[in-house]
């Protein structure tokens, strides 16, 4: 459940309830704070996406979920401008997965061309 849907549905708990009602597997939810992450786990989220672009936020969520004994029951994802050099630090901060959308969307285009040398349509 994306952060805009969380707002439209009235908060993290309501968004997770809506996601669980669909019944298509673990609910993933974007959070922006430790409090939202803890609430999300309590509401049954299976994947917590710390989408703040700040590894300190990810580390704080990871530490708090560990402290509360909740970390083993949930996967942590991290996003927000992730670059290749961020993968190691994200893993060290507790990420099980990373969102590399920007790296893909902002990748330089390849200049490709195709030349047909012969064609046989018989």
Where are the regions a protein language model picked out?
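Alpha/beta enzyme core
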Residues: 3-7, 13-27, 32-47, 92-93
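Glycine- and other small-residue-rich loops at beta-strand/loop junctions that grip anionic moieties
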Residues: 8, 29-30, 50-51, 79-80, ...
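Conserved strand-to-helix beginnings and helix N-cap segments that scaffold or border functional pockets
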Residues: 12-13, 110
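Short beta-strand/loop segments at the ligand-binding rim of alpha/beta enzyme cores
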Residues: 20-28, 64-79
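Catalytic cores of alpha/beta
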Residues: 35-46, 53-63, 67, 76-100
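Short, structured secondary-structure boundary patches
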Residues: 51-52, 69-76, 118-122
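Flexible C-terminal active-site loop/helix
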Residues: 89-122
